[in-house]
Amino acid sequence: MSDDKYHHDKHHDKHHIDSKQSTAAALSSSSTLASSSSMTTTTTTTSTTTTAASPITPKPRKNYPNSADQYELKETIGKGGSGLVQRAICLPFQENVAIKIIDLEHCKNVSLEEIRKEIQAMSLCHHPNVVAYHTSFVYNESLWVIMDFLSAGSCSDIMRFSFPQGFEEHVIATILKEALKAICYFHKTGRIHRDIKSGNILIDSNGNIQLSDFGVSATLIDTGETSRNTFVGTPCWMAPEIMEQVNYDYAVDIWSFGITALELARGKAPFAEYPPMKVLLLTLQNPPPSLEGDGESKWSHSFKDLVEKCLQKDPSKRPLPSKLLEHRFFKQAKKPDYLVQHILAKLPPLGQRYQMLSEDSFAMLRNTSSPQFDTGHSNSADEWIFPNENNDNNNSSTTTTTTTTTTTNPSNNNNNNNNKTKENLTQSPFETPSHTPSTSPGSTPSHSRTSTPTSNHTALGSSSTVVPPPVVPLTLPTAIPVTAAAYHQQQQHHHLSHSSGSIPNHNASSNLGASAHSNVHGLAHSSIHPTSSAASTTVVNNTQQPQTLQPPQQQHQLQQPIKTPSPINAINIVKLNQSDLITPPKTSPKKEGSIPSSSSHGNIPSLVTTSPKSPLQHQQQIPQQQQDPAMINSNNSSISSNGAYNRELISASGSALSKPPSPSSDKENNSTSKSNKSKSRQSSRASSLSESSDSTSHTSSSDEHSSRYESDRKSYKKKKSSSSSSNSKRDRERERDRDRSNKTYKNSRSRNVSRDRERERDRHNRSRDRDRERERERDRDRERDRDRSRDRSRDRSRDRERDRSRDRSRDRDRSRDRSRDRSRERDRDRSRDRSRDRSRSRDSDSRDRSRDRSRSHSNRRRSRSRDSRNKSRDRSSDSDRSRDRSRDRDYKSSKYKKSSRGTSGRKNNKIQSKLDSQATHISYLEDKISTLTNWLQQQNLLNTSNGQVLSPTDPNLVSKLQTQLDVLQSENSYLRNENINLKTIVNGSNSTNNSLNQSSGMAFRNSVSSLHQLNMSNSSNNSRPQTQ
């Protein structure tokens, strides 16, 4: 569309309209359509979207004109369910529109009620995914419906032209998602579409998807019902509940949506190759169709799941459209630009595509002999785009017949279908019966290159002869209605003409209607004997109806394509013109009951179809005697059986019939007396002289002939009476000899004529056989060329399909490889992350364990040291007590001296244990002093590295360390003093105590020196200026 911005702006509302006003508008438009021929329906309802805060006023819609002169029709783009669709230009807006033209007088497939429903549904729909309806009006007994023009056509048309195997999955997801939005809108507004298929899904030039064809949509809001039970839809897409004619609801559109998904995937709907009744049986009896048979790797699991959910025979198990929009399959849907790049970029324009599809389908239909491809009875209501077929108009009140002159062969009837030639068409002057036989494409005769010469002819009496008339154009009399008796007589006449090879003789008193009926029937249904097909002529004579010429306008109206009632036998006019042995019909002497002379009829013109005569043929006709029509009728069967050439003469009443004389009739007529012989010669001379005169001079020539005949007879009597009796015998002998010689001459002449006729017949048969063989050879060559072209086209299509399948397989392989590489990279990254996490967790665990161990060890050491201190303290207190007691006991009596020795040994043991605990505690203090000393040395080294001070030590830290060292020193000195006191008590402990004192003194001295150095460095650092 040229105005895409407006197209989206006028559909920006949320589809909430006043349903009562819209329905009333549609109903009023439909009532006007049924009652008046000047109906004009324009949808002017503007939908509004209101919110709780403030109303939003939409932009005004365009008012399209309601007159046909404001639109310029362009090419045909297809046919819908109820009419022809053409592209047009709206002249006021200069934009493309689609016009559906519906013939209200001859609409066979739809009724006015269906048209009303379709217009009502279109006028109430306003959605970006629904084809927009502008206006409608009546023009020349046709309803014009103006809609948006979607230049890409339907999905079915695109698949038939470029994608016969179906679309890829991304394209299907894009199309189905937009179509599902339109279905959601329909269901929200209380409507059922009931005919969702790819032929009703249209695409514009920008890749936007819209749903069309509301001819079978049902509205549930009008009546307040919750279900429908009408049998509407296309069989392949029809839900099972519609086939069973039970109550159904919105779920039927979900079934059709699933079938449409299969159609877009495979290129055709399930059971599309079967007739409608079998489709109904297969749908009801078989399980629902699915994508399982197409292979596991072709379609994704989400697509299969979508189709399976939609195609549930139980309507309650089918999901809602709003739920289907949330399906994971639609995550692969693309933007409209994707369709433009991958689908619409390589397509020709819609009109050109429609013409190409029409030509291909028409050629396929003509080249096949199957009855299911009959072009005269095709149903074009299925698709938006389909072949251009000539449908018969069964509703017309009158029919027309085709009069053609052909040269055909029964063996090549099927091949003549491909020869497109113009037909000489004339309107029939009578009404054909209601059951008119139709011809199939295989039996349509080809048309000849020559026309049949016609001439006027007048039925003459006894003394009149046939005058060669000039050639005039063939015209038929005016139309005369046919009665029942005339129709019965026509059927009997047709049956006899086909059975015997000649038309029966009827009574001259037949009515005018039967006469006209038989005349035209003789033109259209004349049957010629096989042996005389090249030499027969058809004569039509109007005795009571004057000849009228058709005006140019009427003759132009007669040139319209119609179907011929039956094929017409061949008449080769070239062979007729070249023949020298064809004689015109002879007139017989006037007798009672014979045909009336020209004086009784007057100068009434007639229509004669005959062939020109050669001079030799005219000379041979002069000496022959005239025959009676009764004799000709009696010898008709013998003439046709002997293979002689027939000459048919149809008079005004269809009763007069004359044929050329046979040799047997010549022999009988020549065996008469001498007087009859002279009469025949004189009559032949008179007939030869009268050929150059008109009808008024025939009477005078007949009077001259009679007077001469009387005078010759009188002179002959006188001579005969004056002859002597002596010469009578000799004269009789002479007469006998003359009679014999005349008989032999006539016999030889008749033999020669018959021989010449046989030779000419054989020559004609040979030439006809040669022509037939040539025609057969030509037909064979044409068939060969057609087969070759078909094979080439099939090979090309196969190659194209192979290339497409290869490209698809390559793309699939590439996508698979990419997905595999991506999955492998993901797996590698995951494994790396896992290994890193594991190593980090292991390191952290090991650190935690080591920390825990160190802490546990330190805690254990501290607890041990505390226990040892407590024990040593207890021991020291016990030792002091025991010492005091021992002193007290020493001053007592001597009886306690023995017991004190035993107790002193025990005390020594306790003191030894206390000394051991003090030794361990002293070692712990030394370790702690050494660690502090090492730390101080490291800090000193770091501060004084490379002769520069990196960072000065905090004096608070140094003071804390000093206090800690003091505490340790005091504790150590206390332990040493206690140890000295105890060594006096325990013997042999001097060496260990001295070692302890030396080690503890060295550790203390080291710690004091390191602390002193650290203090010196701090003081030096404080004295220097801080440059960093």
UniProtKB/Swiss-Prot annotation:
The keyword Coiled coil does not apply. ATP binds at I77, G78, K79, G80, G81, S82, G83, L84, V85, K100. Residues 71-330 form the Protein kinase domain. SUPFAM superfamilies: Protein kinase-like (PK-like). It catalyses: L-seryl-[protein] + ATP = O-phospho-L-seryl-[protein] + ADP + H(+); L-threonyl-[protein] + ATP = O-phospho-L-threonyl-[protein] + ADP + H(+). InterPro entries: Kinase-like_dom_sf, Prot_kinase_dom, Protein_kinase_ATP_BS, STRAD_A/B-like. Gene3D superfamilies: Phosphorylase Kinase, domain 1, Transferase(Phosphotransferase) domain 1. This is Serine/threonine-protein kinase fray2. The lineage of its organism: Eukaryota, Amoebozoa, Evosea, Eumycetozoa, Dictyostelia. Residues 701-714, 728-742, 753-855, 865-893 have a biased composition (Basic and acidic residues). It comes from Dictyostelium discoideum. Belongs to the protein kinase superfamily. STE Ser/Thr protein kinase family. STE20 subfamily. Residues 1-67, 368-467, 486-561, 580-914 are annotated as: Disordered.
